[in-house]
């Protein structure tokens, strides 16, 4: 018995594939982590079928490779995501994501009185994980927020 399978999102020859992003989070990751700040082709799949979770998002960035630090920052919002390095249409490296200790110059502090809104400083958060809950503590105002609150703080 043979079956024909068709990729729903075109394969890339060289670059990074971020797979198993929770549905509805892909666009936010593109924006937060400035993944579109490139002139390389980016392919996005939204609400794709997933055996693991029902639905998922997918991002493919040609000729661009995420560092381990960049990939780990994604873990906060896509903890089960996989980040694959592709060379000549083959996966040559899989990055295992883990929460970073800090996230700098990516997120916005939800505290409207925080100096990071009015001063020329990059945001900086300490990442804390306790009992499966992730929170972020702002370096400047020292307030602690649930990671989803910070995700929606734009």
Swiss-Prot record:
Contains catalytic and regulatory chains. The keyword Zinc applies. GO terms for biological process: 'de novo' pyrimidine nucleobase biosynthetic process; pyrimidine nucleotide biosynthetic process. This is Aspartate carbamoyltransferase regulatory chain. Zn(2+) binds at residues 109, 114, 138, 141. GO terms for molecular function: metal ion binding. Belongs to the PyrI family. It holds the Pfam family PyrI_C. Binds 1 zinc ion per subunit. Involved in allosteric regulation of aspartate carbamoyltransferase. GO terms for cellular component: aspartate carbamoyltransferase complex. Its cofactor is Zn(2+). InterPro entries: Asp_carbamoyltransf_reg_N, Asp_carbamoylTrfase_reg, Asp_carbamoyltrfase_reg_C, Asp_carbatrfase_reg_C_sf, Asp_carbatrfase_reg_N_sf. Gene3D superfamilies: Aspartate carbamoyltransferase regulatory subunit, C-terminal domain, Aspartate carbamoyltransferase regulatory subunit, N-terminal domain. Keywords: Metal-binding, Pyrimidine biosynthesis, Zinc. The keyword DNA-binding does not apply.
């Amino acid at each position: 018995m043979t079956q024909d399978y068709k990729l729903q999102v075109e394969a890339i020859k060289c670059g990074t594939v971020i797979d198993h992003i929770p549905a509805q989070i892909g666009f936010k990751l593109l924006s937060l982590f400035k993944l579109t700040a490139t002139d390389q082709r980016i392919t996005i799949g939204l609400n794709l079928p997933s055996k693991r979770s029902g639905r998922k998002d997918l991002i493919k960035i040609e000729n661009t490779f995420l560092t381990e630090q960049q990939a780990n920052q994604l873990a906060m919002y896509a903890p089960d995501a996989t980040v694959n390095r592709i060379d000549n249409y083959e996966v040559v490296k899989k990055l295992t994501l883990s929460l970073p200790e800090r996230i700098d110059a990516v997120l916005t502090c939800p505290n409207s009185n925080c100096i990071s809104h009015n001063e020329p400083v990059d945001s900086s958060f300490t990442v804390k994980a306790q009992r499966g809950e992730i929170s972020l503590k702002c370096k400047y105002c020292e307030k602690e927020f649930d990671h989803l609150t910070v995700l929606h703080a734009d």
